[in-house]
Amino acid sequence: MVAIKNLVLVALTAVTALAVPSPLEARAVTWTCLNDQKNPKTNKYETKRLLYNQNKAESNSHHAPLSDGKTGSSYPHWFTNGYDGDGKLPKGRTPIKFGKSDCDRPPKHSKDGNGKTDHYLLEFPTFPDGHDYKFDSKKPKENPGPARVIYTYPNKVFCGIIAHTKENQGELKLCSH
């Protein structure tokens, strides 16, 4: 009886000691955007919290063509982030800081947007459900919604998600994550 108890104890100890931890799964980063939308029942604006999955937004940017406004919908197109066409920041403008060097440097954007040394930001619609925006839709083009995934030209580095503060118009703000 003692031998059986010892055998069970040794077996349990061996299983515990030899157990290999399983790798942790990386959690998807969720971005939260605040957007004022009109309530059709009250006809008043209400602030909505819109949630975006970073993996889905990055996937949207990878499915987008690497062009500046040359599609039926004009997306993706150059996100100036407050800069002028020469990469200068006009007085009184403050660019959004994404926290990545590729995303925060002043742009270099040639006339056609395809120069060998060009580097700039592109914006492309992204949605809470992660579906791909139909970039070649013409009239009527798909509603782009309030949020945009921002990424770099030419290497498609993910910068972040921004959204209009009121429906699909007005100021663009960096969403939180």
Swiss-Prot record:
Gene3D superfamilies per record: Microbial ribonucleases (3.10.450.30)
Chief location: secreted
EC number: 4.6.1.23
Pfam families for the chain: Ribonuclease (PF00545)
S-S bonds: 33-175, 103-159
Catalysed transformations (reactions): a 28S rRNA containing guanosine-adenosine pair + H2O = an [RNA fragment]-3'-adenosine-3'-phosphate + a 5'-a hydroxy-guanosine-3'-[RNA fragment]
Amino acid composition bias (Basic and acidic residues), ranges on this chain: 99-119
Keywords: Disulfide bond, Hydrolase, Lyase, Nuclease, Protein synthesis inhibitor, Secreted, Signal
SUPFAM superfamilies per record: Microbial ribonucleases (SSF53933)
Record localization: Secreted
A single BP term in Gene Ontology: negative regulation of cytoplasmic translation
Segment forming the signal sequence: 1-27
One GO term describing the cellular component: extracellular region
Region of interest (Disordered), ranges: 86-119
Active site, UniProt feature: 77, 123 (proton acceptor), 164 (proton donor)
InterPro entries noted in UniProt: Fun_ribotoxin, N1-like, Ribonuclease/ribotoxin, RNase_U2
Stated name of the protein: Ribonuclease alpha-sarcin
Species this chain originates from: Aspergillus giganteus
This protein's encoding gene: sar
